[in-house]
Curated annotation (Swiss-Prot):
Record flagged with keyword Transport: yes
Similarity section: Belongs to the mitochondrial carrier (TC 2.A.29) family.
Gene (UniProt): slc25a1a
High-level lineage: Eukaryota, Metazoa, Chordata, Craniata, Vertebrata
PROSITE patterns: SOLCAR (PS50920)
Function, as annotated: Mitochondrial electroneutral antiporter that exports citrate from the mitochondria into the cytosol in exchange for malate. Also able to mediate the exchange of citrate for isocitrate, phosphoenolpyruvate, cis-aconitate and to a lesser extent trans-aconitate, maleate and succinate. In the cytoplasm, citrate plays important roles in fatty acid and sterol synthesis, regulation of glycolysis, protein acetylation, and other physiopathological processes.
One Pfam family linked to the record: Mito_carr
Gene Ontology BP term (one): mitochondrial citrate transmembrane transport
Protein name, UniProt field: Tricarboxylate transport protein A, mitochondrial
Reaction it catalyzes: (S)-malate(in) + citrate(out) = (S)-malate(out) + citrate(in); D-threo-isocitrate(in) + citrate(out) = D-threo-isocitrate(out) + citrate(in); citrate(out) + succinate(in) = citrate(in) + succinate(out); cis-aconitate(in) + citrate(out) = cis-aconitate(out) + citrate(in)
Species of provenance: Danio rerio (Zebrafish)
Length: 359
């Protein structure tokens, strides 16, 4: 079979622990020592061959990880894409409100008095569908973003797991950082730039963009491909720290819950609770970066010379509390987002393991 489907080679050794691994090879006893005469007719020397304790070595696509198999990268990509698509359809209204409040700068007379007022005015003037304006741009980005995130995390984490499949907490932090950087460069920065510009445009008196693809064409025509990578530095910092915190907290809680029994199953409700906790931790950890990123990707991005200049102007003109604008709606959205994504991801992987064999 192609090496693409068998990227990891694992040796199956003897079952020394109380927890038996499938396909374990029996322990072989060492061979008897052999006496070899020394050159020149002197005394003999004793040679003991080194036994092959692990004869059952073969290539595997998966090894036991806490009661489940190592997730094949292609399964992770597929499951991550499905989870990301479903999640964004559920949580987009909170993302819309968060973006609106962040774009509602204090320098101008504020349009909204708070979350409730933002929702009320949006529904009043645009109906319930108004809360889903800009969904297409985020949906097109959420599916590949989640796919890249989980695929990259599995590629990086699988070789770092121990014999029982447990991933060290520090390793999960590094793997999460790598996953966040990958999704930022490949998906998040261009798609988030388009999303913010699209939502901002729809709130103007005379919207220019008739749809997602028309908006992309207009942005590229006016600003080039570089126009879709505005705020790359802020996005790298935000996504890298985001996923590092989330995967670290999630892995920390998972290891604590399973304790000395890596085969212990996690109920979806437990996964959801751990995911919500990881999401909350990431919100308080990097909301300032999210605010700067949103400003750098908005239609007024030309006002800022760089990411640092944007942060300095926000601090100078609006004060430190401006870095936490939209925290409450973002907290609710992210907790729900991360909980849903982790639950859906785990369940889809279980389903794929039943219908898609990679060993």
């Amino acid at each position: 079979m192609s090496s693409l489907y068998k990227p990891f080679c694992v040796s199956e050794g003897p079952c020394k622990d109380a927890i038996l691994r499938r396909g374990c090879a029996p322990l072989q006893h060492p061979a008897a020592p052999t006496r070899i005469p020394s050159p020149g007719g002197g005394s003999t020397r004793t040679f003991t061959p080194i036994p092959n304790i692990y004869p059952g070595q073969r290539t595997l696509a998966a090894a036991a990880i806490g009661g489940r198999k190592i997730t094949h990268p292609w399964k992770a990509i597929f499951a991550g894409g499905i989870a990301g698509g479903i999640e964004i359809c559920i949580t987009f209204p909170t993302e819309y409100v968060k973006t609106q409040l962040q774009l509602d700068e204090r320098a101008n007379p504020p349009r909204y008095r708070g979350i409730g007022d933002c929702v009320k005015l949006t529904v009043q003037y645009h109906g319930l569908r108004g809360l889903y304006r800009g969904l297409s741009s985020l949906l097109y980005g959420s599916i590949p973003k989640s796919a890249v995130r989980f695929g990259t995390f599995e590629v990086l984490s699988n070789p770092m797991r121990d014999a029982t499949g447990r991933l060290d907490n520090k390793a999960s932090l590094l793997c999460g950082l790598g996953a966040g950087i990958a999704e930022a460069v490949l998906v998040v920065c261009p798609m988030e730039t388009v999303k913010v510009k699209f939502i901002h445009d729809q709130c103007s008196l005379r919207p220019r963009y008739r749809g997602f693809f028309h908006g992309v064409r207009e942005i590229i025509r006016d600003q080039g491909v570089r126009g879709t990578y505005q705020g790359l530095t802020a996005t790298l910092l935000k996504q890298g720290s985001n996923q590092a915190i989330r995967f670290y907290v999630m892995n920390l809680l998972r290891n604590w819950y399973k304790g000395d029994d890596p085969a212990r199953d996690m109920h979806p409700l437990v996964t959801a609770m751990f995911g919500a906790t990881a999401g909350a931790a990431s919100v308080f950890g990097n909301t300032p970066l999210d605010v700067v990123k949103t400003r750098m990707q908005g239609l007024e991005a030309h006002r800022y010379k760089s990411t640092m200049d944007c942060a300095f102007q926000i601090l100078k003109n609006e004060g430190p509390l401006a870095f936490y604008k939209g925290t409450v709606p973002r907290l609710g959205r992210v907790c729900l987002d991360v909980a849903i994504v982790f639950v859906l991801y785990e369940e889809v992987v279980k389903l794929l393991n039943n219908v898609w064999r990679t060993d």
